Regions:
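Short, surface-exposed recognition loops or helix-turn segments adjacent to catalytic cores
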Residues: 102-109, 119, 133-134
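Accessory beta->alpha helical hairpin/"wing" motif in late/C-terminal subdomains of nucleic-acid enzymes
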Residues: 60-74, 128-154
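Short, amphipathic alpha-helical interaction segments positioned at domain boundaries
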Residues: 73-90, 142-165
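Short amphipathic alpha-helical interface segments
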Residues: 10-28, 79-108
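Eukaryotic partner-binding/assembly regions in large regulatory complexes
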Residues: 1-65
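Short amphipathic alpha-helical interaction segments
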Residues: 37-46, 108-124
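Intrinsic disorder
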Residues: 4, 111-112, 132
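Short alpha-helical segments that sit at the start of domains
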Residues: 1-13, 62-91
Length: 165
């Protein structure tokens, strides 16, 4: 009986993740959905279900909270190459200056692509505008989109690419 309830909980969480319009979910919410079962056991089984269905489920930290992000292999077709490049540059800048990027500075740096790229990235939750603090941060979804290159993402390397062109 206990095993059936465990499997039902795993199935319920997996279904919720797959059908949710949001591509990310807070760890705290997943813990609450896990009922009285061990969270690590539940999330491990959810991860296997998603992996067996061709998805990836990665962990990212944002504003001192852990998020789980549902992704698939390859690039997101909703994002243009220019938007990918803009997001990569912003992520590299964030890494260099400890993630606190002023909106005013970014508007100046990305003035040519602000309305086409940066606003799209904000509207689609790849970037979050913290208006009260005057900052922009890369969201877990934005980090997930760049997951295959984020470890090597350094501002110096990106600038070298553009310098060599």
């Amino acid at each position: 009986m206990e095993n059936n309830k465990f499997n039902e909980t795993v199935e319920k969480i997996t279904r919720l993740i797959l059908t949710s319009p949001q591509k990310m979910i807070r760890e705290e919410d997943l813990i609450n959905l896990s009922e009285d079962f061990n969270f690590d056991d539940i999330i491990g089984n959810v991860y296997l279900n998603l992996k067996n269905s061709g998805f990836e489920f990665i962990i990212s930290k944002f504003l001192d909270q852990k998020y789980y992000v549902l992704t698939i292999e390859g690039k997101d077709d909703n994002i243009t190459p220019s938007q990918y490049g803009t997001l990569a540059l912003i992520a590299a800048l964030a890494k260099e200056i400890d993630e606190n990027m002023k909106i005013t500075d970014l508007k100046e740096i990305f003035s040519e692509v602000w309305s086409s790229d940066v606003e799209f990235l904000i509207q689609n939750e790849y970037l979050r505008e913290l208006k009260d603090l005057g900052l922009i941060k890369v969201t877990p979804l934005g980090k997930a989109v760049l997951k295959n290159i984020i470890e090597d993402l350094q501002l110096k390397n990106l600038l070298d690419v553009f310098k060599n062109k």
